[in-house]
Swiss-Prot record:
Gene Ontology molecular function: ATP binding; cytidine kinase activity; uridine kinase activity
UniProt name for this protein: Uridine kinase
Annotated metabolic or biological route of this protein: Pyrimidine metabolism; CTP biosynthesis via salvage pathway; CTP from cytidine: step 1/3; Pyrimidine metabolism; UMP biosynthesis via salvage pathway; UMP from uridine: step 1/1
Listed EC numbers: 2.7.1.48
Key words, A-Z: ATP-binding, Cytoplasm, Kinase, Nucleotide-binding, Transferase
Organism, scientific name: Deinococcus radiodurans (strain ATCC 13939 / DSM 20539 / JCM 16871 / CCUG 27074 / LMG 4051 / NBRC 15346 / NCIMB 9279 / VKM B-1422 / R1)
One annotated Gene Ontology cellular component of this protein: cytoplasm
Catalytic reaction list: uridine + ATP = UMP + ADP + H(+); cytidine + ATP = CMP + ADP + H(+)
Domain of life: Bacteria
Alphabetized HAMAP family for the sequence: Uridine_kinase
Length: 210
């Protein structure tokens, strides 16, 4: 957990399509854009530029081993120390990291958003608030289907195949169990306004302690 004078870290976890981004937006609205640094865990998938494209297509993106945990910890620690970072960007059409990065400045609050945000013990130890966004599996699948076809150039068939072969079983094995680490569980996903209001009130109190 962060100490006096250091940024306050919030972990926002939950299944794919559960509403994590909506929760993160509420944090930004609560604290103010310039006061929040956001680390999207999707950008910390391992670089696969040394692997043939056809082989990349078979990557299990829903397994913890797909992530570069060391880099994520390193960059989170840099933000906690007040040092700007160059966050990698992941190209989901090429299934590897993009050549460019995004500069992220330190803020009073750091949000780590991703379905494995609460998976790593070292990352959890840096968090002042751990949130799990819960949503019905059917709702999550529909949201994922729309996102991947509209934003990531995927075909509906490939999204369905990935969901049945990887996403669902990996969620049950690795994501759902991290719910027990959460300080706050938001049922009904990002559409739960009363829960989001309560979360916002809690964040205001905790973020102002320093």
């Amino acid at each position: 957990m962060s100490g006096p004078g250091t940024p306050f870290v919030i972990g926002v976890a939950g299944g794919s399509g559960s509403g994590k981004t909506t929760v993160t937006r509420r944090v930004i609205e609560t604290v103010g854009r310039e006061g929040v640094a956001v680390l999207n865990q999707d950008n910390y998938y391992r670089d696969q530029s040394d692997i043939p494209f056809e082989s990349r297509l078979h990557t299990n993106y829903d397994h913890p081993a797909a992530f570069d945990w060391a880099l994520l910890r390193e960059q989170l620690d840099a933000l906690l120390a007040g040092v700007p970072i160059e966050m990698p960007e992941y190209d989901f059409t090429q299934h590897t990291r993009a050549a460019h990065t995004t500069r992220v400045l330190p803020g009073r609050v750091v949000v780590l958003e991703g379905f494995f945000a609460l998976y790593d013990e070292e990352l959890r130890s840096r968090m002042g608030l751990k949130v799990f966004v819960d949503a019905d599996a059917d709702v999550r699948f529909i949201r994922r289907l729309l996102r991947d076809t509209q934003e990531r150039g995927r075909t509906p068939e490939s999204v369905i195949e990935q969901y049945l072969g990887f996403v669902r079983p990996m969620h049950l094995s690795f994501v759902e169990p991290t719910k027990r680490y959460a300080d706050v569980i938001i049922p009904h996903g990002g559409m739960n306004e009363p829960a989001l209001d309560m979360l916002a009130a809690r964040i205001r109190v905790m973020a102002q302690r320093d």
